[in-house]
């Protein structure tokens, strides 16, 4: 039975032929491509649905090429793929996730997934977090449907080698309630990753952070789309993912502080009150 994947972040020039060639370049054969357009304007909505021969082929393609550079794209882009539910209810089975740190730049979503699924069959996906330029931030997440396998992976793969050129660091990611942006149409079929938070005990320890000072929030991308009188697409993108070790630009911070201080000073100087000679001086009458 045929199965489809959602593909997003498309440029207007990316038509059906472009998408088919891109998959063929990656060694994948697609049955068809449907570009979604606004019915009123005819303008591409920025996403499409790619049909494969069966579910196994679609899943293999998702894990193999998701996050990899998109051939022929200008400006440079990466494959942004997800499951397409087409009216079916999303899979509400429980998810148990791990944070994976110390990833080298060569590790992508497919490599992260393959590293775990070979030993833990309940692994359902891997996500390497990228910055706005498409470069890995050095960490990612994997999710499981079996809590026992998640716990085994945490213990057995802590410090494991074979994924990139550095030993990996693992800690538990605790799920929060998933959030999908609301849309104004009545029918909405969405596939979304849950959001998680965790305290990076092991990851922070390496860099001298106090693991008891707080928690760090992150989320997988979330995709929602509708099939109604119009097609719409809303996404919480990679920019919703935060760096666990943000760099502080001290010079820029001082500059902003001084600018704000100068604005306050100017406001005080522009007011009509004049300083008194002494504490007991009378306040002058208004003119």
Curated annotation (Swiss-Prot):
Gene Ontology terms describing biological process: selenocysteine incorporation
Keyword terms: Cytoplasm, Nucleus, Protein biosynthesis, Repeat, RNA-binding
MF annotations from Gene Ontology: RNA binding; tRNA binding
Statement: the UniProt record of this protein carries the keyword Glycoprotein: no
InterPro entries: Nucleotide-bd_a/b_plait_sf, RBD_domain_sf, RRM_dom, SECp43_RRM2, TSAP1, TSAP1_C
Task performed by this protein: Involved in the early steps of selenocysteine biosynthesis and tRNA(Sec) charging to the later steps resulting in the cotranslational incorporation of selenocysteine into selenoproteins. Stabilizes the SECISBP2, EEFSEC and tRNA(Sec) complex. May be involved in the methylation of tRNA(Sec). Enhances efficiency of selenoproteins synthesis.
Official protein name in the record: tRNA selenocysteine 1-associated protein 1
Provenance organism: Homo sapiens (Human)
Lineage start: Eukaryota, Metazoa, Chordata, Craniata, Vertebrata
């Amino acid at each position: 039975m045929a199965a489809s994947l959602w593909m997003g972040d498309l440029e207007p020039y990316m038509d059906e032929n472009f998408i088919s060639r891109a998959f063929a370049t990656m060694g994948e054969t697609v049955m068809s491509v449907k570009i979604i357009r606004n019915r009123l304007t005819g303008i591409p909505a920025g996403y499409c649905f790619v049909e494969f021969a069966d579910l196994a082929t679609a899943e293999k393609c998702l894990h193999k090429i998701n996050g990899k550079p998109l051939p022929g794209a200008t400006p440079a882009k990466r494959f942004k793929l997800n499951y397409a539910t087409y009216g079916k209810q999303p899979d509400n089975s429980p998810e148990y996730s791990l944070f994976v740190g110390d990833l080298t730049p060569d590790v992508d979503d497919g490599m992260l997934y393959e590293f775990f699924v070979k030993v833990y069959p309940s692994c359902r996906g891997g996500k390497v977090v990228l910055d706005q330029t498409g470069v890995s931030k050095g960490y990612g997440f994997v999710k499981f449907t079996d809590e026992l396998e998640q716990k085994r992976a945490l213990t057995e793969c802590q410090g494991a080698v074979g994924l990139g050129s550095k030993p990996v660091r693992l800690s538990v990611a605790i799920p929060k309630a998933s959030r999908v942006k609301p849309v104004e149409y009545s029918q909405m079929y969405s596939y979304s990753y849950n959001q998680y938070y965790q305290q990076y005990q092991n990851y922070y320890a390496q860099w001298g952070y106090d693991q008891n000072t707080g928690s760090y929030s992150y989320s997988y991308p979330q995709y929602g789309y509708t099939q109604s009188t119009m097609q719409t697409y809303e996404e919480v993108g990679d920019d919703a993912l935060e760096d666990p070790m943000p760099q502080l630009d001290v010079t820029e911070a001082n500059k902003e502080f001084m600018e704000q201080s100068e604005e306050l000073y100017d406001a005080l100087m522009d007011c009509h009150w004049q300083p008194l000679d002494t504490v007991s001086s009378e306040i002058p009458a208004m003119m």
